[in-house]
Curated annotation (Swiss-Prot):
Major localization listed first in the record, in broad terms: nucleus
Summary of the function given for this chain in its UniProt record: Involved in pre-mRNA splicing. Required for the SF3b integrity and prespliceosome assembly.
Cell compartments where the protein resides: Nucleus
Name used for this protein in its record: RDS3 complex subunit 10
Keyword vocabulary terms for this entry: mRNA processing, mRNA splicing, Nucleus
A GO term from the CC aspect: precatalytic spliceosome
Gene: YSF3
GO biological process, one term: U2-type prespliceosome assembly
Subunit architecture: Belongs to the SF3b complex composed of CUS1, HSH49, HSH155, RCP1, RDS3 and RSE1.
Chain segments annotated as coiled-coil in the UniProt record: none
Organism: Saccharomyces cerevisiae (strain ATCC 204508 / S288c)
Length: 85
């Protein structure tokens, strides 16, 4: 019983610390968006990863790649890209 209470306490702490975990009412789409945003945030936050992404995209500067990753995290950005074409 003590182990179960410990696990519930840890789960509560992790949910407060890592918002992307969600809860019972989190939909699949919300969870996927959280994971995607966490990944993009990690890529733009670590210089080595950012440099790798910049090279793979063919961008001339790391700054352009960082801006693209940050814009990609906003919900309306995909609609903006579709309108641009």
């Amino acid at each position: 019983m003590a182990e179960k209470q410990r696990q519930l306490k840890l789960q509560k702490i992790y949910k407060q610390k890592y918002i992307g975990l969600g809860d019972e009412s989190t939909t699949r789409e919300q969870w996927q968006r959280n994971v995607r945003n966490d990944t993009l945030n990690t890529l733009q936050g670590h210089s080595a990863s950012l440099e790798y992404v910049s090279l793979s995209r063919g961008d001339l500067s790391i700054r352009d790649t960082r801006i693209h990753l940050l814009k990609s995290m906003s919900p309306g950005y995909k609609a903006y890209l579709r309108e641009e074409r």
